[in-house]
Amino acid sequence: MSDIIHLLPDHIANQIAAGEVIQRPASVVKELVENAVDAGASNIQVNIKDAGKTLIQVIDDGKGMSETDARMAFERHATSKISTAEDLFSLHTMGFRGEALASIAAVAHIELRTRARGTELGTCLSIAGSNLESIEPEACNEGSIFSVKNLFFNVPARRKFLKSNETEFRNIINEFERIALVNPQVGMSLYHNDAEIFNLPESGLRQRIINIYGKSLNQKLLSLDAQSSMVTISGFVGRPDSAKKRGALQFFFVNGRYMKHPYFHKAIMQAYEQLIPAGDMPNYFVYFTLDPSSIDVNIHPTKTEIKFENEQPIWQILMAATREALAKSSAIPTIDFDVEDAIDIPVYNPVKKSEPSTYKAPKVQVDSSYNPFDTTSYKKPEFDWSKLYQGFENDRVAVQRESETFEDAPIEELPAEASDPEKLFTEVSNPCYQYKGRYIVTSLKSGLAIIDQHRAHVRILFDQYLSNIRQQQGVSQQVLFPEIVEFTAAEAAVLPSLLEDLCFVGFDLSNLGNDNYAINGLPAGIENLDPVNLVKDIVDRAIETGCAVHEKICEAIALSLAKAAAIRPGKSLSLEEMDHLIASLFSCSDSNLTPDGKTIISMLTDEELERRFKC
């Protein structure tokens, strides 16, 4: 039997390795920009064409490379960062494996121009698919210019699975922002198709955050600071009133490296417990500085998952530091334990005889006619108890207001027809009762139905808004004073794909430049809602769901509008409103579930009722 095991050629091995390290254009940006930071650059410029599919160019003024180093940099496991295995536990650089450039060169065309500091002549090198095509001396500036073209040109399967330009560019922005947040001492700029996206000068951390995410964030940040022999924690956390359901800015960095850490995230969330509504997420920018030997970053290809030797103590320190930051801002009420339990007794202050005394002795009312041995001699109460029951027979709706903080939103009428009008009329013609301002109880042919009024209205409005988008029949209500909404670069990148559908549903937006838009008109029926937060929520939902298909984008817009405009728990409804809500619900495409899969109706069948009363 002949031997069947053989070594793979280097170019195939590099393509396999590239599958882990280089997953999309954003991966190339991350690796090249981190290399520029490691090279000591004070200014880094990133130029992108077609979301990185055509060109990714990174220009830095770092220390550059010699001709030999430039050639060696593209060999597998060639690095200047480490020399021994022990160096893995004393890392102070972003890269160390020597895989990135070799992986990029395996799946793209690369042109490198570089000149080391103190030398007169630089080097120009060209590589395509791991093959060195040319290398020659060239006059160029100090530093390096990496130009990556035609990414995945020789791996068509990988290129086919790339997302839309909007999605891929948004991922590039995310990687750029993470590196910019941890290196405020480095000036950084980003251009896409020759349009400036970021121009971040060297600055402090707070100013860098503001330059990236907008001036409105400045007043919402609270300083975070904790120092111990184990770890130093710094950065910022957001005020509780800035928390939101989606699109929160949440970043962890350790020793200058971005990481994901669900366990530490729970520490932050515990500090915000009872300060923000359930489901809301706060902003935070948390930086850990600790001994490199106490962490392990070499456990994931992208180095975003990191193991900590002292995870539990750091968790406690982080939670305590966050609570302290919130307490200093009066977000957490402080308690004076010395006086909290003291009885509040007025202090005796004697007055002079010449001054009139304000003290009045308490009076005790005595019923002189009361005889304990005569049960008929005491006075009867003058209150007419029968008044308690006035109107009881006519009060068919029991309402307990659980919240008065929500704006009343009118129930929108859905112009849809029931699939079986006769059956629908029979089912909803029964009496309705409202329980705790949240549920509608009514009887159907199959039993007793308990309907969540908010979720039911979400389903009704969702179908209506989605129909308006599809039929391009949205009605717009122009506003007297346009609202200005400021988007981040990531939000602005996805907004163009939403504008047409936003227009169909009734929004009127105009571009003011610099990622700012004016809201000139709103969909009819939502005038009482905050238009800025509503538009931001729609964009955040589109980013969160990664909408690339047109239908998914339409659904994301319709769902955001429906959730914002639907009636809230605690809203009292009349019998006519409840009847109309139920009739509209059963006219929907799916009356059992909300668009995001939550239950609307809970049924209690006749059989279940009978079984409960058998005992």
UniProtKB/Swiss-Prot annotation:
<dbReference type="GO" id="GO:0006298">
    <property type="term" value="P:mismatch repair"/>
</dbReference>
<dbReference type="Pfam" id="PF08676">
    <property type="entry name" value="MutL_C"/>
</dbReference>
<dbReference type="InterPro" id="IPR036890">
    <property type="entry name" value="HATPase_C_sf"/>
</dbReference>
<dbReference type="Pfam" id="PF13589">
    <property type="entry name" value="HATPase_c_3"/>
</dbReference>
<dbReference type="InterPro" id="IPR014762">
    <property type="entry name" value="DNA_mismatch_repair_CS"/>
</dbReference>
<dbReference type="GO" id="GO:0016887">
    <property type="term" value="F:ATP hydrolysis activity"/>
</dbReference>
<dbReference type="InterPro" id="IPR002099">
    <property type="entry name" value="MutL/Mlh/PMS"/>
</dbReference>
<keyword id="KW-0234">DNA repair</keyword>
<dbReference type="InterPro" id="IPR014721">
    <property type="entry name" value="Ribsml_uS5_D2-typ_fold_subgr"/>
</dbReference>
<dbReference type="GO" id="GO:0030983">
    <property type="term" value="F:mismatched DNA binding"/>
</dbReference>
<dbReference type="InterPro" id="IPR042121">
    <property type="entry name" value="MutL_C_regsub"/>
</dbReference>
<dbReference type="InterPro" id="IPR020568">
    <property type="entry name" value="Ribosomal_Su5_D2-typ_SF"/>
</dbReference>
<dbReference type="InterPro" id="IPR014790">
    <property type="entry name" value="MutL_C"/>
</dbReference>
<dbReference type="InterPro" id="IPR037198">
    <property type="entry name" value="MutL_C_sf"/>
</dbReference>
<dbReference type="Pfam" id="PF01119">
    <property type="entry name" value="DNA_mis_repair"/>
</dbReference>
<dbReference type="GO" id="GO:0032300">
    <property type="term" value="C:mismatch repair complex"/>
</dbReference>
<dbReference type="InterPro" id="IPR038973">
    <property type="entry name" value="MutL/Mlh/Pms-like"/>
</dbReference>
<comment type="similarity">
    <text>Belongs to the DNA mismatch repair MutL/HexB family.</text>
</comment>
<dbReference type="InterPro" id="IPR042120">
    <property type="entry name" value="MutL_C_dimsub"/>
</dbReference>
<dbReference type="InterPro" id="IPR020667">
    <property type="entry name" value="DNA_mismatch_repair_MutL"/>
</dbReference>
<dbReference type="GO" id="GO:0140664">
    <property type="term" value="F:ATP-dependent DNA damage sensor activity"/>
</dbReference>
<keyword id="KW-0227">DNA damage</keyword>
<dbReference type="InterPro" id="IPR013507">
    <property type="entry name" value="DNA_mismatch_S5_2-like"/>
</dbReference>
<protein>
    <recommendedName>
        <fullName>DNA mismatch repair protein MutL</fullName>
    </recommendedName>
</protein>
<dbReference type="GO" id="GO:0005524">
    <property type="term" value="F:ATP binding"/>
</dbReference>
<comment type="function">
    <text>This protein is involved in the repair of mismatches in DNA. It is required for dam-dependent methyl-directed DNA mismatch repair. May act as a 'molecular matchmaker', a protein that promotes the formation of a stable complex between two or more DNA-binding proteins in an ATP-dependent manner without itself being part of a final effector complex.</text>
</comment>
